[in-house]
């Protein structure tokens, strides 16, 4: 365990640029970095109890010795000279495609009941073994035969020491989701959409500083894997980072994550306040720095919803930025238009709030229906569905959401300018179709076949790669016309104006 150094300091807090007032006692706790966890300085007000984290120092990383043969596994291992963590290397032939092996008794597993399984990961880049504290994950997806899993990795079967990893550009983490993508036989729609969001966010002015430190600019991050359960093929999955405080680099007491669970209730469509009756209600507190004492976060969300409902157009345009990251909201609306994710106008909208700011930042989650997949996965959606419309200066976002209707009506010029900049830059038709081809080509065909044999479901007439590229090529000109009128966009166009 890392040593903590605590001292009491008297710090003068400057309340304005012109005056310095009120001094309060601050307890300062310095936590040095370890092999897998960042160091930081924790400031706690003795009077108010409010804590903040500053001066973060990256984890040092393991300092491994030489690889040694391990008679127990038949492979080899190397041990960190600092913390004693042992990294294993299998003697099995290494697959060019990542494989996850789970072994153990899964009887009784559910969303609330966990089981401990042996876990092994194999790829060309890395291999390791440990234990996985495993549950089912999701809401509606629990009804499908192919389940999502939340896995928490530990060094020991007693789950007393976290097994934190740093691979695939990720920080040291131990919580992951094995996403089944039951409706999406391509297994890549969610990943492609997340990459698009990350590209948009990276090109956004004034991105919140902590999002710059995340692996994917606030989007879910992952990659395809083949999963074997007790030595039998269990399915083609995505191994994603878990949606929590670590994903969003939240370290302070008054940080929070909200997620919309459904597109049906008026609360997630910003027509009425959030009620928070239970975890299956419209809005869910996915994370709160103050734990179950989260009423303040619920109140902050309802302040945003109330503003959207009650403000005049003049107030909405002038003051929205006090409640919601406007640039992020503009990108979110453009994103769901580009990808055709009409359901994500409400459901799976994620809102982030960091301590020191009252502004909610929108980000994306669960995008396996991107590029024209119907909600049940049994059909494809036409490219001309879910487009904004304008009639005599009055815009309809066609999202059935008061937030997006009002944003499109009151920030029309900013949305159109940002859209054109993206379409003539990182979101050209060629760039998007190439993403699709590359993502599908990375998965060996035999795993697609094995997944369909394991989970027989509707075989659509058009193959996923062909359908997605056709959808993009057909939809984008329609969206260009809907948002920009007769201004034709061609690959290679450029635009200098910023939004």
Where are each of the predicted segments found?
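Conserved NTP-binding catalytic cores of kinases and kinase-like/nucleotidyltransferase enzymes
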Residues: 82-84, 89-195, 499
């Amino acid at each position: 365990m890392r040593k903590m150094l605590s001292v009491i300091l008297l710090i003068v807090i400057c309340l304005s640029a012109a005056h310095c007032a009120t001094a309060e006692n601050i307890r300062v706790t310095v936590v040095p970095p370890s092999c897998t966890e960042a160091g930081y300085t924790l400031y706690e007000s003795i009077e108010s109890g409010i804590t903040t984290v500053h001066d973060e120092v990256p984890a040092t990383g393991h300092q491994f010795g030489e690889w040694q043969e391990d008679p127990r596994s038949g492979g080899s291992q190397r041990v960190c000279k600092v913390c004693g963590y042992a990294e294993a290397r299998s003697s099995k032939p290494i697959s060019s495609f990542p494989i996850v092996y789970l072994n153990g008794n899964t009887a009784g597993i559910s969303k609330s009941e966990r089981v401990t399984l042996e876990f092994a990961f194999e790829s060309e880049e890395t291999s390791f073994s440990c234990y996985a504290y495993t549950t089912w994950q999701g809401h509606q997806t629990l009804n499908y035969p192919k389940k999502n899993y939340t896995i928490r990795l530990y060094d020991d079967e007693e789950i007393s020491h976290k097994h934190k990893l740093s691979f695939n550009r990720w920080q040291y983490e131990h919580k992951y989701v094995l996403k089944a993508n039951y409706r999406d036989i391509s297994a890549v729609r969610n990943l492609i959409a997340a990459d698009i969001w990350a590209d948009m966010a990276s090109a956004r002015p004034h991105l919140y500083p902590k999002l710059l430190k995340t692996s994917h600019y606030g989007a879910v991050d992952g990659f395809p894997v083949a999963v074997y359960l007790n030595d039998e093929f269990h399915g083609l999955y995505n191994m994603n980072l878990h949606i929590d405080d670590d994903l969003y680099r939240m370290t302070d007491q008054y940080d929070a994550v909200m997620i919309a669970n459904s597109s049906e209730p008026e609360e997630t469509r910003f027509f009425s306040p959030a009620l928070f009756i239970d975890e299956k209600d419209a809005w869910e507190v996915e994370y709160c720095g103050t734990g179950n004492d989260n009423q303040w976060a619920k109140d902050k969300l309802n302040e945003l919803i109330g503003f959207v409902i009650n403000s005049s157009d003049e107030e909405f345009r002038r003051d929205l930025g006090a409640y919601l990251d406007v640039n992020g909201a503009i990108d979110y609306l453009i994103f769901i238009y580009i990808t055709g994710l009409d359901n994500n106008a409400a459901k799976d909208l994620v809102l982030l709030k960091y301590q020191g700011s009252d502004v909610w930042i929108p980000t994306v989650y669960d995008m396996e229906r991107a590029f024209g997949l119907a909600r049940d996965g049994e059909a494809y959606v036409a490219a001309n569905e879910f487009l904004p419309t304008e009639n005599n200066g009055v815009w309809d976002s066609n999202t059935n959401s008061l937030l997006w209707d009002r944003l499109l009506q009151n920030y029309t010029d900013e949305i159109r300018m940002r859209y054109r900049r993206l379409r003539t830059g990182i979101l050209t038709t060629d760039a998007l179709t190439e993403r699709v081809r590359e993502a599908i080509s990375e998965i060996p065909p035999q795993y697609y076949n094995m997944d369909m044999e394991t989970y027989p479901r509707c075989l659509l007439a058009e193959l996923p790669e062909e359908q997605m590229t056709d959808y993009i090529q057909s939809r984008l000109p329609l969206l260009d016309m809907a948002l920009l009128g007769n201004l034709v966009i061609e690959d290679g166009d450029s635009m200098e104006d910023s939004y």
